[in-house]
Amino acid sequence: MPIRIGFGPLILFVFSCIGIYLACGRHATTRMFAKKFYLFIVLYAVWSLGLILFRGEPFHDNRQIGYTLLITIFAFAGSGMVLIRDPLRAYVLGARVGTLLAVIIAVCLSIVDGGRIGIGGNQAVFAFVAGVAAISAAIPLRNTSRYLPNGPHWLVLGFAAVLTSETRAVIVVLPIFVAVEILIFLKRFSIRQQGAAYAILFAATAALVVVGPVGSIISKRFSGMVEYYDTGRAADWEDKISADIREVMWTSASRVIAAHPFTGVGSYSKMDFVEAEAGDKATMLNGFRHVHNTILDELLNDGIVGLIFMAGAFISIFVYLWRTADSWAMRRALIYFAVICGSYGMLHNPLLHEVTIASTMFFLAALNAAASRRMMAARRAGLISYIFGKKSAA
């Protein structure tokens, strides 16, 4: 199993073990959780691991086994976190501390060493984890610590950390989240105060873009691409090779999927199939373990059936958390999380790296545990259900 020792994933694993124990023991704290989510996750695990056994794939160096087990085990972390008095508060405060550390360390490394900042050399993974941490940190808390206050500044700090990775899939969406949260945050002030704040923000943004590092990073990662599509000159796009590789991978993967739609070809040998379809361009794909697109990767691994189980799991937990959210701020966080996962998943895959899997499941587990505790509190108050804006009396 490809597990890197990390404090966050280790904590999540402990909560997952507790959650599995409580679920197997049919403990009362787990009975009101999102049952459809767990059902689809278990079905996905059985299907994915069953296909691996059916195909006779080797266990050694088979990353799909590890990733499937991680997703399945971490799915039960919410059941373990429900034992914490306020799981959401603990998670959000931890995310705020993590965001602070991420931006400080990333900026320092960028200044001292230069280049793109990543986790284990993987810049995209760092960008995704920092982005999810910033979204989590921006969730408002009641009676929050004065040293870690509520506000949109957490998204700004997260964006600063993500910029050091120069990962386009995350850079393009975080500024939208920042703008929305700043607009909502400033509504509490007078029109005059809002005008002054907007003027300061506009001036600061312009300074960072024109004379600061933001402009150079954006120019480096986006300008060449825009100029290429405007002029057609490949020389204008410095890293066009990355787009060319993805085009070959995705085109070849689509042909493989068309030939094996229901069960896929398996993670262990999928790149062999893709390279065979690539023909004389196969050398461009040397060293790649997946096709850098969540949907295509899943269709290659487990086919349409596996994709249905996976999509069913994440759609069901999203709907459950949306219905049981206690504020519109929580719902916005869910939207931001879905958008960043979608944006990242189009060019990478958050479910094919142990760190991004842990980040994804930690977010869902914390919100899931908080929702369960709200539902249990509603039951104790004589209500039969808790849905945001609708509390049904017993």
Regions found by a protein language model. Give the residues of each.
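Hydrophobic transmembrane alpha-helices of multi-pass, membrane-embedded glycosylation machinery
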Residues: F13-I20, V156, I171-L183, A358-A365
